[in-house]
Amino acid sequence: MSAEQGDPHRLAALAALASAGILAVLSIDIVLSQFPRGLIVLACLVLALAAAWYGLTRTGGARLLGSGIAILVVAVTVAVLIADGDHLAQALVIVASLGLMVLATRSAFRIHVPLQWAPDPRHPVLFYNLKSGGGKAEKFHLADEARARGIEPIELKLGADLEQLVRGAVADGADALAMAGGDGSQAVIAKVAAEQDLPYACIPAGTRNHFALDLGIDRDDVVGALDAFVGGRERRVDLAEVNGRVFVNNVSIGLYAEAVQREGYREAKLRTILDTLPEVLGPEGKGLDLRWTGPGGHEHSSGAAILVSNNRYRLGHAVGSGTRPRIDDELLGITVASAPVAGRGLFQRPWREWSAPAFEVDADGSIAAGIDGEAVTLDTPLRFRILPAALRVRIAAAHPGASPSAAMPEGARETALALARISMGRTPKPQHRQRKEH
């Protein structure tokens, strides 16, 4: 990384540390000068969270009651702050400082990783779905842009078998494969590319493009992603599979998977998930008939949701949450979420997570699941395993080449120390691989 790149990191780190200092001073001042009002405001926020959770996990009148109480308590809290104009201004400064701290921290740890040079392929092929991502392939004229770069475009038409198309292209001499579409389609291309040891490029023309983000591809530069096959760089990443089916991101079981299975999910995603919540997490919920073994070898039969991912996700953090720092740790990420248990307090951590090269989930019948966002039903037991360094990924030289959270430390203390080092001129570097089960 060049010295020129280090200056923006240093400025961002200084801004993050300054914002954190302002945030701490003002927060302490409000609590001390407004005692006991500050504690009352905090209690109101806790009550609002509890009421909101109660409403989400119920149906009918109980849901309306919980939601109504939460809204009322928040309104009272805002009214209390407005009644004191001076402290309202302080509260607004706190919110602004918090936002600046998060944005500056994200910028301070954003890195560009130089990857290994690789020769351009002679016959690269791009598969694209015109409907994916609201029509991004058509909007950005990807077929024409591909031809201009010597890449053969093949449109995925309605009802076509994508895997059959890909294998046909390989048989006809394709020596590199790219996909412009959603993550489910990316997994199909990646599977064939890994089997044939061919270079693969992920073109972010889907709806969310989670795989592209964690690979270090600029999701806003859809056309530029085609340069992966023109002066691009290469890295190897892991894939994962469940019962022989390859996935690039994750497999979800439980709440999200139940919602994805429902007829109205694609038209009203949030509403469908909210309607599913009481059935999975509520007091009258049917729960999940799942059996799995934890990292200590103990058998379990509970959990509101299970997420098995191709490498570990960063969860529960203000910055970088929902991304994977690496996709080459050679380990599955396993997260089991549970409904809150009475007597353990409101702020109990609602999930447990660990990493392992393999994982198994069993049940008495088949299991509804979401594989890279696509609804499926799987026969049990579900056997997951990581496929280490299975995929040769090509990435445009101008793109970051690393996940947004690749250099992000774990924990507030480690983050503060790292920001201090960056502010003194040190450049952020990717975190080390795990390389062990924990």
Predicted regions located by residue number:
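Short, solvent-exposed S/T- and G/P-enriched segments that are highly enriched in secreted/extracellular
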Residues: 378-383
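Catalytic core of DAGKc-family lipid kinases
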Residues: 118-119, 125-133, 137-149, 156-157, ...
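Glycine-rich phosphate/pyrophosphate-binding beta-alpha loops
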Residues: 252, 256, 307-323, 375
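ATP/NTP phosphate-donor binding region
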Residues: 1-177, 187, 400, 409-410, ...
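Catalytic core of tubulin tyrosine ligase-like
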Residues: 389
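Short glycine/serine/threonine-rich phosphate/pyrophosphate-binding segments
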Residues: 184-188, 210-211
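Catalytic phosphate-donor-binding core of small-molecule kinases
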Residues: 47-54, 68-71, 232-235, 277-288, ...
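Gly/Ser/Thr-rich active-site loops/lids in small-molecule metabolic enzymes
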Residues: 265-273, 314-340
